[in-house]
């Protein structure tokens, strides 16, 4: 029994590292420190969302468009963005955000995930895990979500 103690220690260490995520913690702390620079750089350059061709759009309203996320985290993973660029949800008028939510609900019904359940996510600033400074909402569904996704 004693000869297997290293396996136990390795499993415990892997669990602790996975839970604490020190690399992610350091990354987001650095990102938070650089927030003004990140925002300035983001405003100075077009975001990847601004080059999505119209043929890839899966939904549209007067002020918002939707398209499939290329890095899917669920069977249904759609991004909804305002046509006019806002860095974060804090910068956008409430009526634009409401229109984005309305488009997300319409798409959830079209994708038949309205009854089984879906998630709407808006990441804001570094601690909110925002990496692209163009307001965008994730519509996620088609699988059982965990409480911490």
Predicted features along the sequence, with ranges:
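HIT superfamily nucleotide-processing domains
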Residues: 2-149
């Amino acid at each position: 029994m004693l000869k297997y103690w290293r396996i136990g220690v390795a499993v415990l260490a892997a669990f602790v590292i996975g839970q604490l995520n020190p690399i992610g913690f350091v990354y987001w702390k650095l990102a938070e420190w650089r927030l003004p620079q990140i925002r300035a750089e983001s405003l100075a350059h077009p975001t990847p969302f601004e080059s999505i061709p119209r043929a890839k759009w899966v939904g549209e309203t007067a002020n918002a468009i939707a398209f499939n996320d290329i890095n899917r985290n669920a069977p249904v993973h759609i991004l909804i963005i305002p046509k006019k660029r806002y860095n974060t949800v804090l910068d956008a008028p409430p009526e634009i955000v409401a229109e984005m939510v309305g488009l997300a609900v319409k798409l959830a019904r079209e994708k038949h995930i309205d009854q089984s359940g879906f998630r709407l996510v808006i990441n804001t600033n570094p601690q909110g895990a925002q990496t692209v400074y163009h307001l965008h909402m994730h519509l996620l569904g088609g699988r059982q979500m965990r409480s911490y996704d």
